[in-house]
Design a protein with these regions (language model features):
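Transmembrane helix-bundle core of multi-pass membrane transporters
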Residues: 3, 8, 12, 91-150, ...
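Loop-to-transmembrane alpha-helix initiation sites
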Residues: 13-16, 61-69, 88-92, 137, ...
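Short loop segments and helix-boundary regions at transmembrane helix junctions
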Residues: 29-112, 209-221, 238-241
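Small-residue-rich segments of transmembrane alpha-helices in multi-pass membrane proteins
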Residues: 46-56, 94-105, 127, 171-181, ...
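Helix-loop-helix "hairpin" substructures at the membrane interface of multi-pass membrane proteins
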Residues: 129-205
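Transmembrane alpha-helical segments in multi-pass inner-membrane proteins
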Residues: 192, 196-243, 247
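Cytosolic-side transmembrane-helix boundaries in multi-pass membrane proteins
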Residues: 243-250, 254-278
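Peripheral (non-transmembrane) domains and long loops of multi-pass membrane proteins
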Residues: 271-348
Length: 348
């Protein structure tokens, strides 16, 4: 690990991974709530056209990609909000138009080569220099500040757009703001995970967080944690395993999702087993049943198979004897109804 940290390009790569690991899930949490999980892919393919323009003109590809992605974000929201075309169709047009334009433009570049786009398509975080890092840091700061300041209103729109509109919120403006933040996040992340995989870092940490968090705030924290750990861990693993950083980061994020899904499912099954309804008994409890009788308030419990059983009109409530001993009467688990309701129906 000390060897890794002694390398300038790896330190820069780790810093960029942290920035992307925070920014992408923060924007993604609102996209998941609004069921726009694939909008990052559309933005990424439009950004590809911007990268191609930068390569062709000799300008910084990051800046031209940013202009293209932001313009596409605004266009999609305008078409969706005012035009007759639905949002998914508008996104599809931008999706295919962007990638087609990128391929055609890059073919016209004097230095046309697949390597020109590989770093942007699949990520090449270790090739980012200090200037790139400053640009990424500035764009990531825009995303962090924007999501922090707009989070109450973005949450309101994501939760119920029609109610937010009726409440007087500028829904169209907030939609455009979210689309622009998404475009900026795509550009920030394209050198880390690549334009073809950027949606994964926006969506998968949030999918994992929804399994672990019980509230929107908790889910957001979990998403950022999973995003940062996946990004940093993916960079470290890719260095030692000599694998592409983008694919490694995404596979690690998917691994966290699988572990969380498996663990929460197993925990849910264990809890369901603990609260299994009591089976009916083949015999009736009463003075002649032969089991020890224990006075319990205004009725009598009978000890059977390590539990107390209280006869209540055709069913039996099972009580944990350890809890009875601890608190004097306990609350037990019932086949139907609460213990208080069972007491009301007990034979007197």
């Amino acid at each position: 690990m000390s060897e890794l940290l002694s390398l300038d390009f790896m330190r820069q790569a780790l810093i960029a991974a942290v920035l992307v690991g925070i920014a992408a899930p923060l924007v993604g949490v609102f996209l998941v709530q609004r069921r726009l999980s694939l909008i990052g892919d559309g933005m990424g393919h439009v950004a590809l056209a911007g990268v191609a323009v930068g390569v062709l003109t000799g300008k910084a590809p990051v800046l031209t990609a940013l202009v293209a992605a932001v313009a596409a974000a605004i266009a999609i929201e305008v078409i969706r909000g005012r035009g007759r075309t639905s949002g998914d169709i508008a996104l599809a047009v931008m999706f295919y138009g962007g990638i087609a334009a990128g391929v055609v433009i890059i073919a016209k570049s004097p230095s046309s080569s697949p390597a020109n786009l590989t770093a942007y398509l699949f990520g090449a975080i270790t090739t980012a220099d200090q200037r790139d890092l400053w640009v990424f840091a500035g764009l990531a700061l825009v995303v962090l500040v924007g999501t922090w300041l707009l989070r109450p209103w973005l949450f309101a729109v994501a939760n119920d757009e029609e109610y937010a509109r009726a409440s007087g919120l500028p829904v169209t403006g907030l939609n455009i703001a979210l689309a622009v933040l998404t475009a900026v996040t795509v550009v920030v992340s394209m050198r880390v995970v690549g334009l073809l995989l950027i949606s994964a870092l926006m969506i998968i940490p949030n999918a994992t967080a929804q399994l672990l968090g019980r509230s929107f705030r908790a889910s957001t924290r979990w998403a950022v944690l999973v995003g940062v750990v996946s990004s940093v861990g993916g960079v470290i693993v890719s260095y030692y395993a000599e694998t592409p950083s983008g694919g490694t980061i995404v596979l690690l994020a998917i691994g966290f999702f699988v572990v969380a899904a498996t663990g929460t499912a197993a925990l849910a099954r264990a809890r369901a087993h603990q609260h299994r309804r009591a089976e009916r008994h083949d015999h009736e409890h009463g003075p002649e049943c032969g089991h020890p009788a224990v006075a319990h308030g205004d009725h009598v419990d009978y000890v059977h198979d390590g539990h107390r059983h209280a006869p209540h009109e055709g069913h039996y409530d099972e009580h944990d004897p350890a809890r009875h001993a601890a608190d004097g009467h306990g609350t037990g688990s019932h086949d139907t109804g609460s213990h208080d309701a069972a007491k009301e129906t007990a034979p007197r």
